[in-house]
Design a protein with these regions (language model features):
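Short acidic, glycine/proline-rich loop/turn micro-motifs
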Residues: 35, 101-106, 161-163
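Proline- and acidic/polar-enriched loop/turn elements at helix boundaries
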Residues: 83-84, 138-139, 192
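Short, glycine/acidic-enriched loop or turn micro-motifs at the edges of active sites
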Residues: 27, 95, 139, 144, ...
C-alpha cells in the first residue's frame, strides 16, 4: 500500500485540499490464486468471471471496492473507497501525517471489555446491516483510530449467499474470542453466533 496525495474540493473554499489516500496494488504474478478463489467462487456477484489468474486478481480488486462501499453505506467505519482499475484500488488513508493508525493488537481504544464488545459489534453490524461476513477477521485487520475501531482488508468479505458464509462467520467470532480471551471474559462462540444470525436461521 502506497500513500498518495488526493485533491479534494472543499465545501467552503474553491481551493482544493490535499487529502491522503492509500493506493493498494495487487500483484498479478504473485497473488494467492487458491486463497482468492475460495472467497470469489460462490459469491453471486462474481459468478460470471473467468477463473484465470489475472481475472481473479481483477475481481479481487473490484470485490474490495464493492465490499468497502457496501460496509460504509451500512454505517460501518471503514476506509472510503475512491476508485479502482484492474488490480489497483485507491481508498482513504486511515492515519494521520502519513502514519497509519495502529492495529488493534498493538493498542486498544478502551478497556478490553469495551473493545471486545465493539469488535463483536463490528461482526454483528457487518452481518445484519451490510449483509456481509468479513471472512478473515483478526486483530491484524482492525485498526485503532481516534474515535474507535476501524475495519480494513475487505477483499475477501462475502455476501450471506456464499456457501461458506456461515463457516467464515463462526471463524471470525472464534478469532476475535481468541485474541480477547486472555484479556477479558468472552462470549461462548456458539451462543454469539446464534445471537448474531437470529433464531430464524435455525428454523429454516
Amino acid at each position: 500500500v502506497f500513500l498518495a496525495g488526493r485533491s479534494e474540493e472543499s465545501e467552503t473554499s474553491e481551493t482544493p485540499l490535499m487529502k491522503d489516500a492509500a493506493v493498494k496494488i495487487y500483484r498479478i504474478r504473485t497473488g494467492n490464486f487458491t486463497r482468492m478463489s475460495e472467497y470469489i467462487i460462490g459469491d453471486p456477484r462474481f459468478s460470471s468471471i473467468r477463473h484465470t489468474h489475472k481475472d481473479m486478481i481483477f475481481a479481487w480488486t473490484k470485490k474490495e471496492f464493492s465490499n468497502l462501499s457496501r460496509a460504509r453505506e451500512a454505517g460501518l467505519t471503514v476506509p472510503q473507497p475512491y476508485a479502482f482499475d484492474r488490480n489497483i484500488l485507491v481508498m482513504e488513508f486511515m492515519g494521520e501525517n502519513g502514519i497509519a493508525y495502529p492495529q488493534m493488537r498493538q493498542i486498544l481504544p478502551g478497556s478490553p471489555e469495551e473493545t471486545y464488545n465493539d469488535a463483536v459489534g463490528i461482526i454483528r453490524d457487518l452481518y445484519r446491516k451490510a449483509k456481509l461476513v468479513h471472512g478473515d477477521l483478526s486483530e491484524y485487520n482492525i485498526l485503532t483510530g481516534p474515535e474507535g475501531l476501524i475495519l480494513i482488508d475487505m477483499a475477501q468479505a462475502v455476501t450471506l449467499e456464499h456457501p461458506r458464509a456461515y463457516n467464515f462467520l463462526f471463524r471470525d467470532i472464534a478469532n476475535i474470542n481468541r485474541f480477547f480471551e486472555k484479556k477479558c471474559s468472552v462470549c461462548d462462540p456458539h451462543e454469539l453466533f446464534r445471537e448474531i444470525v437470529g433464531e430464524e436461521f435455525f428454523e429454516l
